[in-house]
């Protein structure tokens, strides 16, 4: 029997839904103002050419051409001294009456007139603001970008010279208007869609690198310069400053930065502990790494300088490995590359994977991603194993780009030590859905010793890996190198030499070797778990769960609704089975344990039929999971579960199994329940873990205690 879903909507919610339908959906369409040629300080022929270029429509969204991106020039290490805050040296505004449409030519005014105009416009704040850095700081930090702000639409145009780099914290919506820029390995060119970029202190800061214009263009430098200037003018209601326009040439990159406001950012910022999530970390604050720029600050971006502005630190082996993997995809092989990335904790695997995915997306439409790391997942909440098809760049940490994978299994824990066999069998079931038409990236756990290393050996064999990327740090490797020679004689958890045939190989085919690539991580703090705020592993897991729960919020701007304000689905006990994945719980106590907990919403192949009570699973199944939910309450009298989940009803109707795991709700969801008077639900301090039986009993399946291992002697 499939899940029966009943959900009742209040009248106020219906009125809000009807009202939202009356508003337009396209948020980014803007009216473009046409310029009069008499306003330009150029010849009539040049003005006419600029008008023709400005009248051209903005190119439609397109995929990036299959061209290799230009190399990125890295910032040099500069000393980050304690300096005073840098203030803009010039603030220039166009002389326009705010209540009319008259514009005056600056060239005919006297010096006194221009000074009075600048003073008047600085008081009026006439919808425009230009920000540049003083020449001394530009020379010191290499940041010679120029930005211009349109207050009326809260967006900024950033002009960058070729090879210039902007390292920043914050979040914004980025659109490339002219030229090419690169962010975390992904090349963005003019005409492509806007991309959200997130640079919180949970990870290294992002950088925007100007790659210049396309060299294959048939336009000469003058035509390219006029085209770039015309594009800049299209995004302002009044004439931009001369200082900004003088910086625009045919080799410039013009980027539009807009404030980013999404249900995710609104939901996270509603918690007092997360108000500085997109600000600076303690080290950046202490070293005064922030550059004062009111234009960038207005759109949610803080530029960095000095050693804090290095961004992603790539060693020579890092760059060579990325180049080698791109060549493997571009070359003609009998099958797509299958790339397994491994390494110890805090060695940089996740960042390397994102960089590799973005680099591959410059040359292919999609990349398949097999998630084997239960604790630090990329696209799902923690505790999930998944297979995703990635088609969009990853321009932020994992909690900023969660998505619904095509195939997912709910394991229910942040590690697999308690049941390694179920872990491997779950991955095998996911691997059977790999298409084989796109490059595959396999992300692994940071558990590389003991049984964790045996699991790595199994994964290399079972999935017929073509490339193994092993990240290490320091002078000595953290584990044995996973070369082809070593794999032939190594013992895994399930596989042993001679090599067991891989899932994709014929049993009579000879064993294949793989390409081994070693990457030396040279960034500061490699191998050391994050100790600053928002960098601890449990905090990152909480952010991933909060990001998933934020899908419940409305896409329209408005107040944030607490979890207890959502009307739950009513699910009959007889239509779904329930089980516990991570420990042994007496059947009579399972519903007590599941109340107010996170559950996996799964689909069993067989029907579930109950007789007058809850259906309890005796074993944990390996089955498709469509998402997570919060079991808000249990009504034993009516035989109902009350479930809150962002999963759509069309998908939810196929769910017939609820799996309770070790993944729990973030504390702040329970401690900050707005709108509740008196005692907070599910919160108590009157509890003692010293009472016998108060804690949970961990069961490690398949692992024998050392004292009970029989000796061969």
Curated annotation (Swiss-Prot):
Residues that coordinate or bind ATP: 343-350
InterPro entries, per database record: Clp1/Grc3, CLP1_P, P-loop_NTPase
Keywords: ATP-binding, Kinase, Nucleotide-binding, Nucleus, Phosphoprotein, RNA-binding, rRNA processing, Transferase
Catalytic activity, as annotated: a 5'-end dephospho-2'-deoxyribonucleoside-DNA + ATP = a 5'-end 5'-phospho-2'-deoxyribonucleoside-DNA + ADP + H(+); a 5'-end dephospho-ribonucleoside-RNA + ATP = a 5'-end 5'-phospho-ribonucleoside-RNA + ADP + H(+)
GO molecular function: ATP binding; polynucleotide 5'-hydroxyl-kinase activity; RNA binding
Location relative to the cell: Nucleus; Nucleus, Nucleolus
Major subcellular location class: nucleus
Compositional bias annotation for Basic residues: 1-32
Enzyme class of the recorded protein, top EC level: transferase
Gene3D superfamilies xrefs: P-loop containing nucleotide triphosphate hydrolases
Ranges for region Disordered: 1-39
E.C. code: 2.7.1.78
Gene Ontology CC entries for this record: nucleolus; nucleus
Source organism, top-level taxon: Eukaryota
Keyword Transferase attributed: yes
Oxidoreductase recorded as keyword: no
Mutant phenotype after disruption: Morpholino knockdown results in hypoplasia of the pancreas, liver, and intestine and defective hematopoiesis. Defective pre-rRNA processing within ITS2, resulting in the accumulation of ITS2 containing rRNA precursors.
GO process annotations (BP): cleavage in ITS2 between 5.8S rRNA and LSU-rRNA of tricistronic rRNA transcript (SSU-rRNA, 5.8S rRNA, LSU-rRNA); definitive hemopoiesis; digestive tract development; exocrine pancreas development; liver development; pancreas morphogenesis; rRNA processing
Entry's family note: Belongs to the Clp1 family. NOL9/GRC3 subfamily.
Family matches, as PANTHER family: CLEAVAGE/POLYADENYLATION FACTOR IA SUBUNIT CLP1P (PTHR12755), POLYNUCLEOTIDE 5'-HYDROXYL-KINASE NOL9 (PTHR12755:SF3)
Function: Polynucleotide kinase that can phosphorylate the 5'-hydroxyl groups of single-stranded and double-stranded RNA and DNA substrates. Required for the efficient pre-rRNA processing of internal transcribed spacer 2 (ITS2). Essential for definitive hematopoiesis and pancreas morphogenesis.
Protein name as it appears in the record: Polynucleotide 5'-hydroxyl-kinase NOL9
Lineage: Eukaryota, Metazoa, Chordata, Craniata, Vertebrata
């Amino acid at each position: 029997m499939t899940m029966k879903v009943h959900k009742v909507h209040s009248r106020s919610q219906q009125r809000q839904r009807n009202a939202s339908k009356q508003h337009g959906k396209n948020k980014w369409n803007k009216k473009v103002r046409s310029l009069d040629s008499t306003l330009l300080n150029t010849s009539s022929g040049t003005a006419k050419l600029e008008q023709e270029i400005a009248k051209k429509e903005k190119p439609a969204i397109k995929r990036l051409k299959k061209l290799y991106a230009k190399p990125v020039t890295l910032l040099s290490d500069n000393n980050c001294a304690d300096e005073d805050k840098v203030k803009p040296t010039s603030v220039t505004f166009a002389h326009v009456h705010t209540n009319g449409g008259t514009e005056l030519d600056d060239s005919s005014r006297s010096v006194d007139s221009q000074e009075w105009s600048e003073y008047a416009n600085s008081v009026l704040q006439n919808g425009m603001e230009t920000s540049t850095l003083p020449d001394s700081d530009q020379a010191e930090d290499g940041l010679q970008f120029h930005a211009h702000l349109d207050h009326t639409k809260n967006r900024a145009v950033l002009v960058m010279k070729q090879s210039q780099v902007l390292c920043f914290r914050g979040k914004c919506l980025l659109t490339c208007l002219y030229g090419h820029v690169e962010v975390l390995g992904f090349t963005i060119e003019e005409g492509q869609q806007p991309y959200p970029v997130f640079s919180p202190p949970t990870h290294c800061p992002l950088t925007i690198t100007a790659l210049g214009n396309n060299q294959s263009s048939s336009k000469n430098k003058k035509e390219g310069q006029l085209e770039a200037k015309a594009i800049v003018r299209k995004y302002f209601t009044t004439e931009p400053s001369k200082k900004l326009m003088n910086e625009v040439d045919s080799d410039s990159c013009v980027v539009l930065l807009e404030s980013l406001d999404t249900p995710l950012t609104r939901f996270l910022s509603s918690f007092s502990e997360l108000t500085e999530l997109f600000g600076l970390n303690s080290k950046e604050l202490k070293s005064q790494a922030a550059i004062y720029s009111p234009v960038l600050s207005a759109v949610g971006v803080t530029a960095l300088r000095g050693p804090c502005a290095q961004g992603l630190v790539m060693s020579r082996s890092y760059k060579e490995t990325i180049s080698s993997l791109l060549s493997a995809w571009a070359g003609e092989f009998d099958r797509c590359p299958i790339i397994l990335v491994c390494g110890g904790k805090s060695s940089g695997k996740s960042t390397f994977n994102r960089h590799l995915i973005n680099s591959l997306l410059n040359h292919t439409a999609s990349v398949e991603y097999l998630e084997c790391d239960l604790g630090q997942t990329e696209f799902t909440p923690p505790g999930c194993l998944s297979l995703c098809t990635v088609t969009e760049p990853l321009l932020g940490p994992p909690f900023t780009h969660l998505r619904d994978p095509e195939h997912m299994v709910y394991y229910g824990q942040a590690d697999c030590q308690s049941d390694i066999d179920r872990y491997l069998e779950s991955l095998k079931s996911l691997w059977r859905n790999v298409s084989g038409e796109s490059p595959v990236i396999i992300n692994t756990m940071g558990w590389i010793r003991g049984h964790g290393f045996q699991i790595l050996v199994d994964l290399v064999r079972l999935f017929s890996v073509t490339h193994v990327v092993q990240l290490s740090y320091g002078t000595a490797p953290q584990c044995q190198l996973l070369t082809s020679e070593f794999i032939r004689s190594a013992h895994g958890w399930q596989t042993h030499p001679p090599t067991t045939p891989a899932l994709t190989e014929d049993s009579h085919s000879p064993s294949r070797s793989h390409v081994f690539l070693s990457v030396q991580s040279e960034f500061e703090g490699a191998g050391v778990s994050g100790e600053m705020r928002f960098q601890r592993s449990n905090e990152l897991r909480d952010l991933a769960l909060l990001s998933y729960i934020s899908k419940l919020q409305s896409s329209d701007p408005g107040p944030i609704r607490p979890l207890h304000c959502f009307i739950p689905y009513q699910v009959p006990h007889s239509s779904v089975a329930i089980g516990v994945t991570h420990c042994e719980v007496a059947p009579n106590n399972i519903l007590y344990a599941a109340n107010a907990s996170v559950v996996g919403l799964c689909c069993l192949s067989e029907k579930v039929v109950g007789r007058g009570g809850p259906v309890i699973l005796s074993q944990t199944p390996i089955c498709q999971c469509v998402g997570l939910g919060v079991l808000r309450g249990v009504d034993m009298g009516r035989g109902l579960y009350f479930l809150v989940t962002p999963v759509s009803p069309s998908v939810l109707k196929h769910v017939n199994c609820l799996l309770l795991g070790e993944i729990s709700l973030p504390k702040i969801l329970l401690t900050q329940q707005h709108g509740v008077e008196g005692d907070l639900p599910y919160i108590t301090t009157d509890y003692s873990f010293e009472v016998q039986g108060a804690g949970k009993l961990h069961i490690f399946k398949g692992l024998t205690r050392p004292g009970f291992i029989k000796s061969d002697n």
